[in-house]
Each structure stands twice: as structure tokens, then as C-alpha cells.
Swiss-Prot record:
Biological process terms in GO annotation: protein catabolic process
GO molecular function: leucyl-tRNA--protein transferase activity
One Pfam family recorded for the sequence: Leu_Phe_trans
UniProt catalytic activity: N-terminal L-lysyl-[protein] + L-leucyl-tRNA(Leu) = N-terminal L-leucyl-L-lysyl-[protein] + tRNA(Leu) + H(+); N-terminal L-arginyl-[protein] + L-leucyl-tRNA(Leu) = N-terminal L-leucyl-L-arginyl-[protein] + tRNA(Leu) + H(+); L-phenylalanyl-tRNA(Phe) + an N-terminal L-alpha-aminoacyl-[protein] = an N-terminal L-phenylalanyl-L-alpha-aminoacyl-[protein] + tRNA(Phe)
Family matches, as InterPro entries: Acyl_CoA_acyltransferase, Leu/Phe-tRNA_Trfase, Leu/Phe-tRNA_Trfase_C, Leu/Phe-tRNA_Trfase_N
Family that this chain belongs to: Belongs to the L/F-transferase family.
PANTHER family tied to this protein: LEUCYL/PHENYLALANYL-TRNA--PROTEIN TRANSFERASE, LEUCYL_PHENYLALANYL-TRNA--PROTEIN TRANSFERASE
Subcellular location: Cytoplasm
Top-rank taxon: Bacteria
UniProt name for this protein: Leucyl/phenylalanyl-tRNA--protein transferase
Length: 234
């Protein structure tokens, strides 16, 4: 397997077809906003653990939720309709990152959200490209997720919950909002049973790249996101 070393002075990536069987494509570079946005445009994302160099991935197949195939399980929709949680956008981005980083993940000895990753996504948030969706209960943040928006694609990064269904409710609000805004898909990156229940599929990389190309031709919704006053996700 060939592993590419990225230069520090140019935001370039090798062709994703050069990725290894596990999706690993390249090593090194940096986490500047320019490089991160270029990576997402090309179907690549960073993922590495404490003490590791920056690793860049483009798995094949790719877990993707086409938003026209969104399915909300009936029991979960009852929870959404019950309004147990107040859902907000972009009001506690740093707190969502902190909680995602603190959440234990099966098979991982430590968090992949190392401090430099949190700083990088915080910069993207301040530039209006990264967003948080938060579930609140009694004035307390109890669940949420964050990701990057580019054109008509949303690239989900991580989620957490401190109460049952909190992150799932936040995701339903996000997905329905993205549909109303004309987004095409949510990139789930890694396959999970949780996302498959929402209608996600394992998409061949070539098909994902075609969807990505079409989606990134749409204008990006840059800036702080707010829920439309009359929006409901049902």
C-alpha cells in the first residue's frame, strides 16, 4: 500500500483512488481551514488519535444518508413530537465538541478529537462552515452533534448524548432542516447501525464522489445557522 506524505506548503491531496483497503490515503499536512475544506470537497476527512500524525481517509464504501431516503422510526418521531428537548443551532459549539471528545467510543482507547482537531473545527465554526445542533433539557445541554456544511452536503463528524434519544432527536431536526434547505446528503463517514436505521446506505466511493460533485455545485450556506421561526420537523 502506498501512503502519501502531504506537503506543508500546498493544500493538495492525491487521487482518492490511491487510498488503501481501509480508506487511509495520506499523512501529514495541517488542519488549516483551507486544507480541511479542500479535503471535504474531494471526499476526504481527517481522523487520528492522540500522539499520531494527521491521517487522511477516504473509505470505500462510504456510509451516506441520501436525504430523499430519510426514514425516522415511528417511536423516535413520537419522542420528537413530544418536545421533550429544546433544539438549538450554533449556540454551544465548543461545548458540543467537548462532550463529543469526552464520550467513550467502542474499540478506541482515547478520543480522536484531540486538542488540535477541536481547535481546527472551532476555526471552521467561526468562519461559518462548521455547525452544532444541540438538544437541551431544563436549560442543560444533554445531546447534540456537529459537522461541516459544504454546498448541498453535510459532513457529520460526531455526536453525544447524556439522556436517551437526545442526539437522535437533534439529528432528526437537522435532517429535516437540511431537506427544507435543499441539501442532498449527510456524509456519515463510518457505517453504524444507528445511521442505517435512518436510511443511510453503503455507497461505492465513485458514486459518493459523483453525489459530492453535484452537491458542491450548490451555494454554501455560510454563517451562523438559526432555526426558522415556523420550522417543525414533522
Amino acid at each position: 500500500m502506498r501512503l502519501y506524505l502531504l506537503p506543508d506548503d500546498a493544500c493538495i491531496f492525491p487521487d482518492v483512488g490511491e487510498a488503501g483497503p481501509d480508506g487511509l490515503l495520506a499523512i501529514g499536512g495541517d488542519l488549516t481551514p483551507e486544507r480541511l475544506l479542500r479535503a471535504y470537497e474531494e471526499g476526504i476527512f481527517p481522523w487520528y488519535g492522540p500522539g499520531d500524525p494527521i491521517l487522511w481517509w477516504s473509505p470505500d464504501p462510504r456510509c451516506v444518508l441520501p436525504l430523499d431516503a430519510l426514514h425516522v422510526p415511528r417511536r423516535l418521531m413520537r419522542t420528537v413530537r413530544a418536545k421533550t428537548f429544546e433544539v438549538r443551532l450554533d449556540t454551544a459549539f465548543a461545548d458540543v465538541l467537548e462532550q463529543c471528545a469526552a464520550t467513550p467510543r467502542p474499540g478506541q482507547g482515547g478520543t480522536w478529537l484531540v486538542p488540535e482537531m477541536r481547535a481546527a473545527y472551532t476555526r471552521l465554526h467561526h468562519l461559518g462552515h462548521a455547525h452544532s445542533v444541540e438538544a437541551w433539557y431544563g436549560g442543560r445541554l444533554v445531546g447534540g452533534l456537529y459537522g461541516v456544511a459544504l454546498g448541498g452536503g453535510f459532513f457529520g463528524e460526531s455526536m453525544f448524548h447524556a439522556m436517551p434519544d437526545a442526539s437522535k432527536v437533534a439529528f432528526v431536526w437537522l435532517a429535516r432542516l437540511l431537506v427544507s434547505w435543499g441539501f442532498r446528503f449527510v456524509d456519515c463517514q463510518q457505517t453504524t447501525s444507528h445511521m442505517l436505521r435512518f436510511g443511510a446506505v453503503e455507497m461505492p466511493r465513485t458514486d459518493f464522489l459523483a453525489c459530492l460533485h453535484d452537491a458542491t455545485r450548490q451555494p454554501s450556506r455560510i454563517g451562523r445557522w438559526r432555526l426558522p421561526q415556523d420550522f417543525v420537523p414533522w
